[in-house]
Amino acid sequence: MSFFTQLCSMDKKYWISLAVLSVTVLISALLKKRATETEDIVVVHYDGEKLNFVLRQPRLNMVSYTSFLRRVCNAFSVMPDKASLKLNGVTLKDGSLSDQNVQNGSELELELPKLSPAMQQIEAYIDELQQDLVPKIEAFCQSSPASAQDVQDLHTRLSETLLARMIKLDAVNVEDDPEARLKRKEAIRLSQQYLSKLDSTKNQNK
């Protein structure tokens, strides 16, 4: 029996199954190609991390620098005020991304300005306050003390610790740094709120 005769003698169901499989594979390939053609991906690096940003609607040629920067900063949980994006070392400007040679597959760098020495000290103060003292203050305000003396002792210890740190904060030189001066005011205001909270709890437990 010839090869052609063997083919003709094959079950009709086999040919139908083969045809269905071929069509399925073809459709899958077309859909995958279409999906690729209808989306752009831009990679952004920041602080050792890398995120892929998929752009479908609107497409890359319709996306502005400002809106994309806002999306990137939100994903990395940073403030967009002074952040910037760079492509091959060149800082991007407001306007269309595609007009600045950002293409599908481009890799960008998210950069934030370096903090001044004064800002670094103030940020360190706030971090230490939030991570170290605030949990202790909150625990003091929510606990049921054994005696009025316990309240007094713990209040004194926490208040003196906070005041000592505020004195160091006040010594930070912000004379030529308006931004640091404003940030220090915010830190002092926050600290005073916790001092008031300590005093209020002490007075309630007299």
UniProtKB/Swiss-Prot annotation:
| Record PTM Phosphoserine, positions in chain | S144
Q: Does the keyword Phosphoprotein apply?
A: yes
The UniProt record lists the BAG domain at 122-202
Q: Which Pfam families match?
A: BAG (PF02179)
Q: Which InterPro entries match?
A: BAG_chaperone_regulator, BAG_dom_sf, BAG_domain
> What is known about its subunit structure?
Binds to the ATPase domain of HSP70/HSC chaperones.
Put simply, this protein is called BAG family molecular chaperone regulator 1B
Q: Which organism is it from?
A: Schizosaccharomyces pombe (strain 972 / ATCC 24843)
- What gene does this protein come from? bag102
